[in-house]
Amino acid sequence: MKEYLFLLRGGKPVTDKTEAEKKAEMQAWGAYMGSLGEKGQFVGGLPLVSGGMVVTPEGLKSEPVNSGKEGIVGGYLIIKAENQQKAAELAKACPHIANEGNIEVREIAPMPAM
C-alpha cells in the first residue's frame, strides 16, 4: 500500500459549536480513527496549533498562514491506501468533511534507497 497525506483545511470553528456538537464530533473522530487503525491504514496525524509562520527567501512572515479559499490547514493525517481513489474514499468518510471542511489528498513519495 502507498502512503497518503491528508491536509485538513477549513471547517467550522470549535468556538461556533455547542457542547453536544463537540461531543458528537469527538465520537465520530474516535470511530473513524479506530476504523483506520483496525485496518492497518493509520500511520499518524495530529491537529495543528492556530497561527504559524512562512519562511521565504526574503525572511519570515508571522502573519496567519492561509491556504486561500480552501481555508487554513488545521491538521493532517497520514494513511495507507491501495491508490489515490481509495485514499479519496477514506477522506470522504472523514469527520472533517461533515464539519464543513475539505481535505487535500497527496501521495507521499517513497524515499529512494541510499
PLM region spans:
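Conserved, structured core segments of small domains
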Residues: 1-114
